[in-house]
């Protein structure tokens, strides 16, 4: 994990990413905390983005939580990876997370806007029930366009 620190030179960071490809337990790359913190998040997102849908699927909730703040390192890498994901696999978890966030909409307003970006995943977008799709489409159009 030390090699992934953004304070390292690019060669060391690339070596860290390369070595991480052999790590089987990828939950270590889901926004690690102390002692590494945000300094490694961008490279962790790069590592996760290279993983298969099958490898990532147990961590949908954590990946969606990464979208809570667009300023967090690696957020756009995670967004772009989720847009490419098999939407059918993501549908149930995405719907649950969005409905949970809507229960406290005022507190989760920005996160819901960020989650709306995943409507660009056409399989996911098509699979949403009409009501949820319309709510998120309105957010998408007001935030991303």
Task: Name the predicted role of every residue range.
Residues 98-100, 114-115:
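Short, intrinsically disordered/low-complexity patches at protein termini
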Residues 2-4, 11, 22, 112-145:
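Eukaryotic acidic, Ser/Thr-rich intrinsically disordered low-complexity regions
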Residues 3-8, 33-39, 65-73, 100-106, ...:
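Short coil turns that connect the paired helices of HEAT/ARM alpha-solenoid repeats
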Residues 1-2, 22-33, 53-65, 87-99, ...:
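Amphipathic alpha-helical scaffolding segments comprising HEAT/armadillo-like alpha-solenoid repeats
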Residues 10-22, 41-54, 65-69, 73-85, ...:
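Structural detector for internal amphipathic alpha-helices that build alpha-solenoid repeat scaffolds
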Residues 1-26, 34, 38:
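Short terminal alpha-helical segments
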């Amino acid at each position: 994990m030390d090699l992934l620190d953004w304070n390292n030179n690019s060669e060391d960071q690339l070596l860290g990413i390369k070595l991480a490809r052999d790590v089987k337990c990828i939950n270590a790359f889901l926004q690690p905390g102390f002692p590494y913190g945000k300094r490694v998040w961008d490279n962790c997102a790069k590592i996760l983005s290279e993983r298969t849908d099958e490898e990532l699927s147990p961590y949908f909730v954590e990946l969606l939580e990464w979208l809570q703040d667009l300023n967090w390192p690696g957020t756009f890498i995670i967004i772009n990876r989720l847009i490419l994901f098999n939407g059918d696999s993501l549908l149930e978890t995405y719907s649950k997370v969005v409905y949970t966030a809507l229960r406290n909409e005022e507190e989760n307003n920005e996160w819901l806007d960020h989650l709306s970006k995943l409507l660009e995943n056409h399989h996911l977008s098509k699979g949403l029930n009409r009501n949820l799709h319309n709510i998120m489409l309105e957010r998408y159009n007001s935030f991303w366009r």
